[in-house]
A protein has these predicted regions:
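Blade/loop signatures of beta-propeller domains
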Residues: 23-43
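Conserved beta-propeller blade signature
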Residues: 68-70, 111-113, 161-165, 212-214, ...
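Blade-loop segments of beta-propeller domains
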Residues: 48, 74-112, 116-117, 140-142, ...
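Short loop/turn segments immediately following the C-termini of beta-strands
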Residues: 74, 117-118, 167-169, 207, ...
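Blade-level signature of beta-propeller repeat domains, shared across WD40, Kelch, NHL, RCC1
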Residues: 301-334
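Beta-strand-rich domains and repeat architectures in extracellular enzymes and scaffolds
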Residues: 42-75, 325
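Beta-rich, blade/repeat-based domains predominating
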Residues: 50-66, 94-109, 141-161, 192-212, ...
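Surface-exposed loop and turn segments in beta-propeller and other repeat-based domains
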Residues: 39-51, 91-94, 133-149, 181-197, ...
Length: 334
């Protein structure tokens, strides 16, 4: 009798603890408002056994022209189909710790540009095959004497110029030409209007002419602001404040998705007015918390939103800064 009871207990424990079974019971969660309403896709990006497919995440997301999704994790870059299955991965030493990514088509071929904070460099590699084109170490020709170089963001202008933000160290933004040759640097660390205090994320803001840089100034006081700088490195304006801890920015048309490390994602329109807030976490213990285990994830609730990207249909892919490794798909409701 005791043996039978023990067997039953073990079976029940296995069923309850089985991540795959748990995912089958999760229902989609609707979030947002108006034209920026989304449904979650439970279990998207997980392995068949229900566990995370990527391991710890502290990176970004991009989508190629075929609709495949690339997310960077500590151990490398994983490629997902739109349905959420891993179809490829880049796990060589060159692809670890990509804190931010940008994808770009050049002469009919796609390339990923990455900022590697722990490896003190930027990188460019081919999407097809993963061949490394070049790396961007600290440019000695800048004349700066830095104790540390820790790039957190990268973007590329229409003419091919590359911008690499040293967001975890000096807060200078370094400009290179399309071959990787150093051109200039601008910005400095501080809390002044034109200064940067953790220039954590950055993209090319194509909503305006001329194009400009849209920069996440994560720890500036007041916290949570986005800035515009010209492509020549001139301060333009303070775009918006009060966004918590903005980590990155991704643009589609007139809209910008802004992951906030405090457990939400904000969507702005062309006037930089908030259109929707997604995945808000009401538990202060889970906000900006890397150590939220997969068993404690809540569908439709974020904990440390770090990267995002749009696909051609307006769906969003969102990565949490997370010890278990979390990436989510949000389907646009139309």
């Amino acid at each position: 009798m005791k043996n039978a009871f023990l067997c039953l207990t073990l079976v029940l424990s296995f069923v309850i603890a089985d991540p795959a079974q748990a995912q089958q019971d999760v229902k989609p969660v609707r979030m947002g408002s108006g034209i920026m309403t989304f449904d979650t896709v439970p279990g998207w990006g997980l392995r068949p056994d229900g566990n995370s497919a990527v391991g710890p995440t502290h990176g970004g997301v991009v989508v190629d022209k075929a609709g495949n999704i690339y997310t960077s994790a500590d151990q490398g870059v994983f490629v997902f189909s739109p349905e959420g299955q891993v179809i490829h991965s880049y796990l060589d030493a060159d692809f670890t710790n990509l804190h931010d990514m940008e994808i770009r088509e050049e002469n009919g071929e796609e390339y990923i540009y990455g900022a590697r904070n722990k490896n003190a460099e930027g990188i460019k590699f081919k999407v097809k095959g993963g061949e490394v084109v070049f790396k961007l170490p600290f440019p000695e020709e800048s004349g700066l004497e830095l104790k540390r170089f820790s790039p957190t963001a990268i973007t590329v202008a229409t003419n091919g110029d590359i911008y690499l933000s040293d967001g975890y160290a000096s807060n200078y933004i370094f400009r290179f030409d399309k071959t990787g040759k150093y051109i200039s640097h601008f910005g400095e660390k501080g809390n002044g209007m034109k200064q940067l205090n953790t220039a954590h994320g950055m993209t090319l803001d194509t909503r305006y002419e001329p194009h400009r840089l849209l920069i996440c100034d994560r720890n500036h006081t007041p916290k949570g602001r986005l800035l515009h700088y010209s492509l020549e490195g001139e301060f333009i304006d303070e775009v918006v404040t009060g966004l918590g801890n903005p980590t990155s920015v991704a643009i589609q048309g007139d809209y910008v998705s802004v992951p906030d490390l405090l457990g939400r994602l904000v969507i702005l329109d062309k006037s930089n007015t908030i259109m929707a807030v997604l995945g808000f976490n009401s538990d202060p213990e889970q906000r900006r918390n890397y150590k939220v285990l997969q068993k404690d994830w809540i569908e439709g609730v974020f904990s440390g939103t770090h990267g995002s990207y749009w696909d051609k249909d307006g769906n969003l892919y969102v990565q949490d800064w997370n010890v278990s490794g979390r990436i989510m798909k949000l389907v646009r409701v139309k």
